[in-house]
Amino acid sequence: MTTTSVCPFSKAARPDDGSTRKQGEITASGCPFSKAARPDDASARKQGETTASGCPFSKSARPDENGSKGCPEQEGNLNKDSTDSATVPAKCPFGYDSQTFKLGPFSCMLCQALLYESSRCVPCTHVFCKVCLTRFKDCPLCGADIESIEVDENLQKMVDQFIEGHARIKRSVVNGTEKEEVENDNKKVIYADVSMERGSFLVQQAMRAFSAQNYESAKSRLAMCTEDIRDQLGREGNTPELCSQLGAVLGMLGDCSRAMGDSSSAVKHFEESVEFLMKLPLNDLEITHTLSVSLNKIGDLKYYDEDLQAARSYYDRALNVRRDAMKHHPNAPSQILDVAVSLAKVADIDRTLQNEVAATDGFKEGMRLLESLKLDSEDSALEQRRLSVLEFLKKQVETDAETAL
C-alpha cells in the first residue's frame, strides 16, 4: 500500500529528495498546492477554456490568435493520414502540437518556465532566460551563431506585470498614497492551455526552472510564494493548511540554496520549514514525511560540514518523527521503509563516532523491519526500494562482524 498525496503541500515540496546522502529516501511528485491537476497532463485540459476579458495580456495569450492549433511555420506541412512509418513528425519548439502542453508567450523554451532575466540573442533576436541561454554558443531555436546577448528589459517588465497581476495570491493597487489590497485568492491563473490555482502556478514555474537547473528563477518564484503565504498567515492566523504550505515552500527554497552551494541559507530555510511543520498535528503521513525529510536534509548538511554530533541529533529527530508516524499508521509500508532509512542514517553516524554497539543495533533493527515487511505484488517500486535498503543494511552488519573478528 502506498500513501497518496492528501496534504496541500505533499511530496512535491522536495524536487531533489532523491539527492540525499543515503539511497532509498524517495518522494513522489505532486504540486504543493495539489488542488490543481498536473499542468502538463494532456488529460487535464478543459475544452473551451478561455482567458478572462479585460486583461491587458489577453490578446497575447495565444500566439496563434486566429485559431490555428499548430505552429505557423509547420502548418500544412504534416499529412496526418500519412502511413509512412519512417516519417517522424516535426515538433514545434513552443509546444503547438497535440502531444505536448503549450508554452505561453512569456515562457522560456529551454526551461519551460516563465522568463527570468529575459535575454535576447543577437542577431536572431530569440529570447530565453539568461541562465538558460548562457549555456549555448548557437541559438537553441534557429541555430544561428550568438554574437552577443542583450538584456530585454521591456519583455521582462511584461512578465513581471503578468505575475503581479495574475499569478500572485494577492495584488496591491496604488490608490493615492495608500495601498488597497485586492483579494484574488479564489481566482485562477489562465495561461497557455491550463487553468490553475494562483499558488500552484508559481510553484509549477519554480519546479520547472529547478529541473532545468535555473535555480535563480526557481528561488525568485518560491520567494514570491513565501511572501504571499506569510501575508495570508497574517490575515488568517496559523491554519494547518497555510503552515503546511509555507513549510513545504521553505523546504523547496532550502533545496534551491543547497543546489547553489549556499549551505547556510539552506539550513536556515530547512529549519524554518521544520518550525512551521511542527505547529501541525503529526497524524498526517504527508506532513510527517515532509517534516522528517527537512530534518534529514539539515542532518546531511551538518554531516558535510563535519559536525557529526549535530548531524546525529537531526537524524535522530527525523527517526523519532517517523517512529511516531509508524505507530499511527502501522499498515503503511512506505512509513516502515522510511523508519528503516532513518535507522541506517543514525547507525552510520554512530559508527563514525565509534559507537559500534549502537550502530550494529540500529542496522539490525532496520533489517528486522524490512525482512518482516510483506508487500503486495503491485507495489513493485516499494519492493525495489525495500531490497535496496535491506542490501545496504546487511552489508553494514557484515562489515561490523568482520571488524569484530
UniProtKB/Swiss-Prot annotation:
Record GO terms (molecular function): zinc ion binding
Biased composition (Polar residues): 76-85
Upregulation: Up-regulated upon H(2)O(2) or salt treatments.
Record-linked InterPro entries: TPR-like_helical_dom_sf, Znf_RING, Znf_RING/FYVE/PHD, Znf_RING_CS
Regions of compositional bias (Basic and acidic residues) in chain numbering: 13-24, 37-48
Known outcome of mutating C111S: No effect on the interaction with CAT2, but no increase of catalase activity
Effect of C129A: No effect on the interaction with CAT2, but no increase of catalase activity
Single Gene Ontology BP annotation: positive regulation of catalase activity
Gene null: resulting phenotype: Hyponastic leaves and reduced growth. Severely reduced catalase activities. Hypersensitivity to multiple abiotic stresses.
Zinc-finger ranges (RING-type): 108-142
Keywords assigned by UniProt, alphabetized: Chaperone, Cytoplasm, Metal-binding, Nucleus, Repeat, TPR repeat, Zinc, Zinc-finger
Distribution of this protein across tissues and organs: Expressed in roots, stems, leaves, flowers and siliques.
Any single GO CC term annotated in Swiss-Prot or TrEMBL for this entry: nucleus
Region annotation Disordered: where it falls in the sequence: 1-85
Subcellular locations according to the entry: Cytoplasm; Nucleus
Sequence ranges of the TPR repeats: 247-280, 292-325
PANTHER family, per database record: OS01G0104100 PROTEIN (PTHR15315:SF89), RING FINGER PROTEIN 41, 151 (PTHR15315)
Subunit structure: Interacts with the catalases CAT1, CAT2 and CAT3. This interaction is not induced by alkaline stress or H(2)O(2) and NaCl treatments.
Protein role: Has holdase chaperone activity that may fold catalase to a functional structure. Not required for the peroxisome import of catalases. Required for the activity of catalases and acts mainly at the post-transcriptional level.
Domain free text: The RING-type zinc finger domain (1-158) is involved in the increase of catalase activity and zinc ion binding is required for this increase.
The protein's name: Protein NCA1
Species of the source: Arabidopsis thaliana (Mouse-ear cress)
Lineage, uppermost ranks: Eukaryota, Viridiplantae, Streptophyta, Embryophyta, Tracheophyta
Gene that specifies this protein: NCA1
